[in-house]
From Swiss-Prot:
The gene is ATG4C. It is found in: Cytoplasm. One of its GO terms (molecular function) is cysteine-type endopeptidase activity. Its EC number is 3.4.22.-. Cysteine protease that plays a key role in autophagy by mediating both proteolytic activation and delipidation of ATG8 family proteins. The protease activity is required for proteolytic activation of ATG8 family proteins: cleaves the C-terminal amino acid of ATG8 proteins MAP1LC3 and GABARAPL2, to reveal a C-terminal glycine. Exposure of the glycine at the C-terminus is essential for ATG8 proteins conjugation to phosphatidylethanolamine (PE) and insertion to membranes, which is necessary for autophagy. In addition to the protease activity, also mediates delipidation of ATG8 family proteins. This is Cysteine protease ATG4C. One of its GO terms (biological process) is protein processing. Keywords: Acetylation, Autophagy, Cytoplasm, Hydrolase, Phosphoprotein, Protease, Protein transport, Thiol protease, Transport, Ubl conjugation pathway. The modification N-acetylmethionine is found at residue 1. SUPFAM superfamilies: Cysteine proteinases (SSF54001). InterPro entries: ATG4_LIR, Papain-like_cys_pep_sf, Peptidase_C54, Peptidase_C54_cat. The modification Phosphoserine is found at residue 451.
């Protein structure tokens, strides 16, 4: 009886936190963001310059866009469509209870897990759909209607679907391969893309069996001493994402892996080994890899000398974003203009959407408006992500990133490095992972160290 009373108190507490959180952040979501027409805007390796939106696609040299072979003029609508097409993952409420707790929301503590999900989602978008893909309905999302993004309206989206369900919901991730699903649409490119689009979002659903959903990520976090309701930092989330992808058994995910840099060092042979690992299918191609590099951009505060480095990273075609934020808040950084970073904010709490339902609503998984913040406000602790489709792509990326690191760094040493060979060649002990424990002892030590260094999340 006492336990029941405690659960009720916890539920009331979470409802209050969600309501307070939305009151705090909803005005931010609805506030207009202003962009200059005189400076280029970079979004995950694509350059837009609104000053030339009515002109030819070739920009003049003084425009500021210098990404070879990837320069586009792009008008405002093209930029909006590109931004809105990125997958937005936020706090949710009223989802199935997290095992071992009374929590049915991540409001107040799950923001870095959400920004990590957004980075991984962008990597999967590149893997399955490519950087040129945009959601056809992106511009149908209106940000001017202040009611559009309230929790009440989100419930309207799901109400019609709930009416079709009887009895207790079953939360499950479809096991049919994407290739099987889209087979009959092989001549319909748009249908193929839409199937992948929905499938990727479903992998991040807030149900226990969603491959990269909050419930699963928390389970992997338990192996490092984390639990639901704890604060997670960018480096810890990087390792959790790696484990989630490694453990995913979905046939469509056997061609991608994640590598997490050790002590700001990417060991080229270790990455290539992961990409060349035997695949479960008949496809003998190299695996794609998402490289995650946890770094600190200074001591207590971000060193402004790293501004050009961050801008250089976000200008690369290989970049899938940065898990970062400002003190007490985690954001997903996806671009910049001048000295301001462009980001997506996970702090707005939306209602649970059951992604196992056919044609579930997509609107709440796409952010209607970009936000900007000064680089000076950025917390120094962050994790940078890159995507490479195969071994050759990785080799090109490592060369290009190394050049960028040298040119953008005012420090004597680059923020991170690519080195030839394996980590074991540099006196790192290679530990075999216990089958009963997803994290090795070395990984646990790393995770505990990272968790004490990183900022507190709201």
């Amino acid at each position: 009886m006492e336990a029941t009373g405690t659960d009720e108190v916890d539920k009331l507490k979470t409802k209050f936190i969600s309501a307070w959180n939305n009151m705090k952040y909803s005005w931010v979501l609805k506030t207009k963001t202003y962009f200059s027409r005189n400076s280029p805007v970079l979004l995950l390796g694509k350059c837009y310059h609104f000053k030339y939106e009515d002109e030819d696609k070739t920009l003049p040299a003084e425009s500021g866009c210098t990404i070879e072979d990837h320069v586009i003029a792009g008008n405002v609508e093209e930029f909006r469509k590109d931004f809105i097409s990125r997958i937005w993952l936020t706090y949710r409420e009223e989802f199935p209870q997290i095992e071992g707790s009374a929590l049915t929301t991540d409001c107040g503590w799950g923001c870095t897990l959400r920004t990590g999900q957004m980075l991984l989602a962008q990597g999967l978008i590149l893997h399955f759909l490519g950087r040129a893909w945009t959601w056809p309905d992106a511009l149908n999302i209106e940000n001017s209607d202040s009611e559009s993004w309230t929790s009440h309206t989100v419930k309207k989206f799901t109400a019609s679907f709930e009416a079709s369900l009887s009895g207790e919901r079953e939360f499950k991730t479809p096991t049919i391969s994407l290739k099987e699903t889209i087979g009959k649409y092989s001549d319909d490119h748009e249908m193929r893309n839409e199937v992948y689009h929905r499938k990727i979002i479903s992998w991040f659903g807030d149900s226990p069996l969603a491959l990269f959903g909050l419930h699963q990520l928390i389970e992997y976090g338990k192996k490092s001493g984390k639990k639901a309701g704890d604060w997670y930092g960018p480096a810890v989330v990087a390792h959790i994402l790696r484990k989630a992808v490694e453990e995913a058994r979905h046939p469509d995910l056997q061609g991608i892996t994640i590598y997490v840099a050790q002590d700001c060092t990417v060991y080229n042979s270790d990455v290539i080994d992961k990409q060349s690992a035997s695949m479960t299918s008949d496809n003998a191609d190299d695996k794609a890899v998402i490289i995650l590099v946890p770094v600190r951009l200074g001591g207590e505060r971000t060193n402004t000398d790293y501004l050009e480095f961050v801008k250089g990273i976000l200008s690369l075609e290989y970049c899938v974003g940065i898990i970062g934020g400002k003190p007490k808040q985690s954001y997903y950084f996806a671009g910049f203009q001048d000295d301001s970073l462009i980001y997506m904010d996970p702090h707005y709490c939306q209602s649970f959407v059951d992604v196992s339902i056919k044609d579930f609503p997509l609107e709440t998984f796409h952010c209607p408006s970009p936000k900007k913040m000064s680089f000076r406000k950025m917390d120094p602790s962050c994790t940078i992500g890159f995507y490479c489709r195969n071994v050759q792509d990785f080799k090109r990326a490592s060369e290009e990133i190394t050049k960028m690191l040298k040119f953008s760094s005012k420090e004597k040493y680059p923020l991170f490095t690519f080195v030839n060979g394996h980590s074991r060649d540099y006196d790192f002990t290679s530990t075999t992972t216990n089958e009963e424990d997803l994290f090795s002892e070395d990984e646990k030590k790393q995770l505990k160290r990272f968790s004490t260094e990183e900022f507190v999340l709201l």
